[in-house]
């Protein structure tokens, strides 16, 4: 888990000195998976949208450290939640980013035209590092409970990897999981407002 988190942080910080390769990328719009009945536990997320997710089954272990919450399941996969920080999207010290806008730019929901060269190059390097340019990963965009959600799907060490970006007012909830497609689809389907 720490290795995966460290790798993700490297990706989100951008690759220093990475070539600014053209990477025209756009998230595909996706249908929200159908909700299933019942929840073993509810994960309530702080923020303007008062969002919550049904965990479907109780985790074997629940770990909380600072702003990070990790649920580990008996099958060996995990679900982690934290709020995305501006420096993870390339903000300089003291700079305040509009995080939802940065996520939309990264995943192609907004055009890169007209951005300063340095910002466009940073976004292209992040897309490259995430595997979006060479199609090692894919992104789908959902609208669930009035919330814009981006789902990055790829693999790490031969196992499925998913990252969910939930745009909630000025903040972005970041969830990642090594669970199956079905597990993540159940999470998406259960997203609602309290």
Residue ranges and their predicted role:
Residues 5, 17-18, 128:
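Disulfide-bonded cysteine motifs in exported proteins
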Residues 14, 26-29, 137:
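Extracellular/secretory pathway and lumenal proteins
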Residues 19-84, 88-92, 156-160, 168-194:
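N-terminal targeting sequences that direct proteins away from the cytosol to non-cytosolic compartments
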Residues 8-16:
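Bacterial N-terminal signal peptides
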Residues 1-8:
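Bacterial N-terminal signal peptides that target proteins for export
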Residues 65-161, 165-167:
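Conserved polar/disulfide-associated segments of primarily extracytoplasmic proteins
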């Amino acid at each position: 888990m720490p290795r995966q988190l460290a790798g993700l942080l490297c990706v989100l910080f951008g690759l220093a000195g990475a070539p600014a390769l053209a990477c025209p990328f756009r998230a595909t719009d996706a249908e929200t998976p159908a909700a299933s009945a019942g929840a073993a536990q509810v994960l309530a997320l702080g923020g303007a949208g008062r969002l919550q997710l049904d965990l479907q089954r109780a985790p074997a272990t629940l770990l909380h450290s600072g702003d990070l919450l990790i649920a580990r399941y008996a099958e060996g996969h995990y679900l982690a939640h934290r709020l995305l920080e501006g420096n993870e999207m390339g903000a300089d010290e003291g700079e305040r980013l509009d995080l939802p806008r940065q996520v939309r730019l990264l995943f192609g929901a907004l055009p890169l035209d007209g951005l300063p060269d340095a910002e466009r190059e940073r976004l292209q390097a992040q897309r490259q590092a995430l595997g979006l340019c060479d199609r090692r990963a894919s992104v789908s965009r959902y609208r669930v409970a009035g919330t814009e959600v981006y789902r990055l799907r790829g693999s790490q060490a031969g196992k499925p990897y998913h990252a969910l970006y939930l745009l909630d007012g000025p903040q972005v909830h970041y969830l990642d999981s090594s669970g199956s497609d079905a597990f993540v689809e159940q999470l998406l389907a259960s997203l609602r407002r309290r």
